[in-house]
Amino acid sequence: MALNSSAFFVPCHNYNQICDLLLSSARTRSTIKGLQLHGYVVKSGLSLIPLVANNLINFYSKSQLPFDSRRAFEDSPQKSSTTWSSIISCFAQNELPWMSLEFLKKMMAGNLRPDDHVLPSATKSCAILSRCDIGRSVHCLSMKTGYDADVFVGSSLVDMYAKCGEIVYARKMFDEMPQRNVVTWSGMMYGYAQMGENEEALWLFKEALFENLAVNDYSFSSVISVCANSTLLELGRQIHGLSIKSSFDSSSFVGSSLVSLYSKCGVPEGAYQVFNEVPVKNLGIWNAMLKAYAQHSHTQKVIELFKRMKLSGMKPNFITFLNVLNACSHAGLVDEGRYYFDQMKESRIEPTDKHYASLVDMLGRAGRLQEALEVITNMPIDPTESVWGALLTSCTVHKNTELAAFAADKVFELGPVSSGMHISLSNAYAADGRFEDAAKARKLLRDRGEKKETGLSWVEERNKVHTFAAGERRHEKSKEIYEKLAELGEEMEKAGYIADTSYVLREVDGDEKNQTIRYHSERLAIAFGLITFPADRPIRVMKNLRVCGDCHNAIKFMSVCTRRVIIVRDNNRFHRFEDGKCSCNDYW
């Protein structure tokens, strides 16, 4: 960028005024106005003044134009510590962590000392990269420079360790800080929520309220996420009420978490109400609502919302398209799914392995297994476990054991794989009556020292989660639960229910198969709900694995015989059973 050096000597009030205008343009995202100001700065030679250069870097950073920030930085002949801090922060804020850390190295090579503005940007970059090793180096640097006791630097370190999964280090840092602010508390809560340590996160939130800490939207979002992950609907509603009293319910950040809470707890109408009440919607809340509709089989609403999102001017990202593809897959809309897959290229978004896995799943569910295989064969990137796994699952559904074995071999060629792949192959063999091959697949799993994930179902009652495993009798109400199932079983048989014992994936005699399938975990959880909840309350059951075909059929009969709404969330989607019908239309 050419500079007019003869115009450098200008009255001081001129460059102060320019700085104020650049700051205003950054705050209001007035890109055109900012570009015009930059042109004036160049013509008048004001870019030689460090304060002006700093404001130019900040303007481009806030406008999400980090490479223009870099040009402004490079055009500045006098780079102060603040100039370096501005560019390092710019890269961190614009998701360019490696560049942020690279410029930190350059700054230190110039014998400039990083301060309490630079160090938080560096730790943020480490958190984005999940590079705890580099983060520890930044931590050491903060100790050498004496900034480790600074509340902002300390908070950023807590956040970094938490996001890198080093929850013990995060808590140690949190406990040793001489002073904490709301960012510190929120970072620690987020860390516990991310690691699934929900009780710790909730306890910390209560402690923050007890200390009269002015919690922020990040705090609310973290604790609402805990309630969502634990499916604690009633507690989540209470915290939602608290967020309204604190005026944080209109935040897109909190709104996204609330949408996820109501969706994961089986209340999609609550999710949509929250979505509608957030005045300014960011991409996160659009994606959260799309996912909620997709999980609840509201495919048409997904497509309508996607169109509405684009009309609003919001640009979709890879998560947006993944939600739309999953919705099409679950509804069997293959042609529509292919259309949206192709639209990704028009939006200049390269499909990831997750998008290809969704496309393979879509074709596989529809029985178009050869087309699914062709998609994998022609992928421009290497197929991952999730891609081959999608084909393997479809082969199990359509009892194509030869192709299932081929897909499994391809997965095993990738190296160590999840236990789910072995189980899927075993299930494919068992579904086809090849119990000897199924046993071999499970033996291979045992020989590798891996364990099959235990199927669990759980239900919330008065902020307490009751968990059940198939056939267990450890619950305090086991006697009543099994009596209820026996009574309900008789009513279901009178209504025409016949157990499909082909879903018992091991070779046992007919009577034992009949008994085994009647006591799957979701049935125990439903029976608990029937004897515990009032008649007008829907029974909401969560399950960590896919619901089996016979249980899916049985729950339809249960909804008829009990005249109850039963909502089951498995590891894939929601099923709402009412009057003998399921929201998935038996396509899952």
From Swiss-Prot:
Pfam families: DYW_deaminase, E_motif, PPR, PPR_2. Residues 387-462 are annotated as: Type E motif. GO terms for biological process: cytidine to uridine editing. PPR repeats lie at residues 14-48, 49-79, 80-114, 115-149, 150-180, 181-215, 216-250, 251-281, 282-316, 317-351, 352-386. SUPFAM superfamilies: TPR-like. Residues 494-588 are annotated as: Type DYW motif. InterPro entries: DYW_dom, E_motif, Pentatricopeptide_rpt, PPR_At4g14850-like_plant, TPR-like_helical_dom_sf. Belongs to the PPR family. PCMP-H subfamily. This is Putative pentatricopeptide repeat-containing protein At5g52630. Keywords: Repeat. Residues 463-493 are annotated as: Type E(+) motif.
